[in-house]
Each structure stands twice: as structure tokens, then as C-alpha cells.
Amino acid sequence: YRQALVMSAVVCGIAAYHYFRIFDSFNAAFVTEAQGGRGMYEQAAGHSFNEGYRYVDWLLTVPLLLAELIVVLALARKLQTSLLVRLIPASALMIALGYPGEISSDTFTRNVWGLLSTIPFLYILYVLFVELTKSLDRQPPAVRKTVSNMRLLLFASWGVYPIAYLIPIYFGD
């Protein structure tokens, strides 16, 4: 589990850095006149919120999280390599394809890039739910249950992102 722990620490470090940057970007981009933190935030003159920090964070951490998941399963080296070679590029592609839509104010453009980024997302789910299942037949029931729970948690948590991506398109900012 040493590799997984190292990857986990790297993910936490990358995320901490980027979320501090996101916090700073938000503080520079938005102001409120209210006392005690209550009131509406408005765009600060001459500043904009940098969406790039979040996407760079995801571009680095999502492939690492998927690699960590595969490494911790202690699968046969050939299967592990096969899964990593498919999951890591798909996750990077998913994030990279979502960014142009995220920064666009045009609904059509957001929809196109959102749809394009959903294709690698569905592929990742396919690999985790179909391809990984084939290798679990030889595992004890407890391992199969743990992996099944992990996949459902991943689907539930990552499944929020396409919904959150679509909300500004159909319901406004």
C-alpha cells in the first residue's frame, strides 16, 4: 500500500495548493459591502475568477486517484497496466474536454464540450464496471463487495459533476 499512500499524499498536496489558489482568486474577484459576511457578492472591478485552477487540479489529481484505486487492488501486473493505460488518458481527456465549455458563455459551445467530456467519463465507468468485474471473479466475496461499494461511491460522487456542469446552461448562473 506504500504506492497508494504516496499517491494519496501527492493528491492532497496538489489539491491543497490549488484550492488555496482558488480561494485567493475568489477573494480577488468578488466583493461584498455587507458586514459580518452577509450579503450579495459582486464581481470586483478589474478582476475575474480563475476557473483554470480547478481544472488543472482535476487534470492532475483525477488520473492519480484512478491510479491509486488500481494500485491498491493489487491486481496482476498485466491487468493493472491494462487498466491504467486506459483509465489515465481517459480521465485526462475528460477534464481537458470539459474546460472549454466551462469557460464559454455560449450555450451551444458549453453543450458540445460537455457532451464531448461525457464520452471519456462513460468510458471510465465502463472500464470500472465491466472490465474490472471480469477480474473480480477470482477474488474473495469481501473484496468484490468493497470494489462494488467503491464503484457506486465513485459513480455517485462523480455523477454530480455533469449535473453541476449543466445547471448554469439551463438555469443560469
Task: Describe the role of every protein-language-model region.
Residues 4-11, 57, 83, 87-90, ...:
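Hydrophobic alpha-helical transmembrane segments of polytopic
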Residues 81-86, 111, 132-159:
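Membrane-helix boundary/juxtamembrane motif in polytopic membrane proteins
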Residues 55-87, 99-103:
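Internal transmembrane alpha-helix with an interfacial aromatic "cap," most often the third helix
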